[in-house]
Amino acid sequence: MPYSLSLKTSWKTFLSNQKSRTEFFLTIIILAAVLISFSQFLLFVEGRTGVILFDPILNLYSPIDLTWFTFTLIYLSLLTALFELVKAPERLLLALQCYGLMVIFRAIAMYLMPLEAPSNLIPLNDPFVQLFGKGNILEKDLFFSGHTATLFLLFLLIEKRNLKIIFLIFTLLVAVSVILQHVHYSIDVFVAPFFAYTSYKIILYFKEKGLKNE
């Protein structure tokens, strides 16, 4: 079946179910509210004083600018995941819910762990943001690494084996890259997959519980 026809059929079936339709639009609204609130929270984080951690790994070498390499992997992953997930509305819904919960975990973690950026970091400037906007460059959104966690979450969400392997490799490459660039402390990156996995399992638990109660 052609991609466009498959897409149309799957979404028509999904949206014809009132429960699925309501859950999807509520998820979009809640996620939008979470992301807007989180963007304001990041300004608060950027303005407060934190602590500089001693990181034995970062102390071993000088930072390397891997900005373009990192964002190439990130955007390639996001586009590939979107192409796959949009074909399966239920899976896309799961992805949005997991991501929203993970962002909430990031906000809580950052609030409880006020950190200063590593002293010799090279800022990770998003090429897309810098090209089309004038967004502030954030340096204190540290614990935990959102880039690493997001890619690991995509690894969990994608069902095709070959793509899962690629996403896992990309996760490892991005994790290493942000450490090499001194954008994050090692601990920020090390714990990121655990938060992604926890978000994924929590949402799955409530979905399975909801199905049993139907």
Residue positions per predicted region:
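Active-site His/Glu-centered metal-binding helix of metallohydrolases
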Residues: L73, A149, S186, F190
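Membrane-proximal cytoplasmic C-terminal regulatory module of class A 7TM GPCRs
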Residues: I202-E214
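N-terminal transmembrane-helix/juxtamembrane module of multi-pass inner/ER membrane proteins
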Residues: P2-S77, L115, I122
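Membrane-interface loops
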Residues: V45-F54, V86-K164, T171, L211-E214
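Aromatic-anchored segments of alpha-helical transmembrane domains
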Residues: L35-S37, V103-A109, T171-H182
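Interfacial helix-loop-helix junctions of multi-pass membrane proteins
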Residues: D141-F143, L173-S199
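Alpha-helical transmembrane segments of multipass membrane proteins
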Residues: I30-F38, L42, F105-M110, F195-Y200
